[in-house]
């Protein structure tokens, strides 16, 4: 679904979204609105209706490296918004309300050997803040960026990834918030000619975390890979919404998201709930497009819900390939039986299957410390699963 600045919603087809920097151009979301129908609006603490007034501060720390420039800029900086236009009211509210933005620029021809680490600390419990972050990789540059979120509070932000011609950016976006955090994040990626983006989202913590990622190509030959890993526990709502907008020839996109869910039979909190919505639009002029998207969800216990909605809209016959797949279910009984027949205990067999399920994503993360951290986090969640099973 491509974003159309200032257009009427009624004039748009299924593959196009209204977009505006003006929060008043959007109606207050309701439960029947397509882009909000899975989101628990009552748990957003007013981020969606304008009643959440900023009263805190988010802390952003960027590691310093040669060839990388970090700036704190005001609202009037002309670079802000070049990556994309807000397509929902919360993103527009965040764009209208942030006080300063962090801009990280990788210079032309710069090959950054070690990851750029960006630590984002929440405003603290009871506080509300709006933010803006832009990552730009100039022509022929290359970088790996890890954006790590921790802490508490209520937060809405826009994050821009601008990858200029023949540049390469790998970004690992991690939400490891405290259990009380509400975070709505809109990601806007713009790829130049022959640019490459690897966008990986990892969602582990938080009460409500919703990430909306829009990817656009501004020239031919772009290559975007969007990977996601999420593990939802009791009381969590984790939502991922993707749009890959193909409007230029010979571009590629590959989407693979995997999630696991577990509940707590004695808890009074809402059931664990994950949402994945993947939209791909191929315009008439986007000949030679090659795209595929997959979402898999592994249900570990009762008391959970996983919604998965892939959408593919093709407006030209001259493509290399396009497809999507989605599946939600429990452990494969045949795989479990095979491991048990080899003398492996049931708990260990389940652990091995979950490790294998997520291994396809984890193996593609180019930062060893992040891989190790994710493996440890998954092991911790599985320990919780086993302890609840034993208690019941």
UniProtKB/Swiss-Prot annotation:
GO terms for biological process: iron-sulfur cluster assembly. It holds the Pfam family SUFBD_core. Belongs to the iron-sulfur cluster assembly SufBD family. PANTHER family: PROTEIN ABCI7, CHLOROPLASTIC (PTHR43575:SF1). This is Iron-sulfur cluster assembly SufBD family protein ML0594. It comes from Mycobacterium leprae (strain TN).
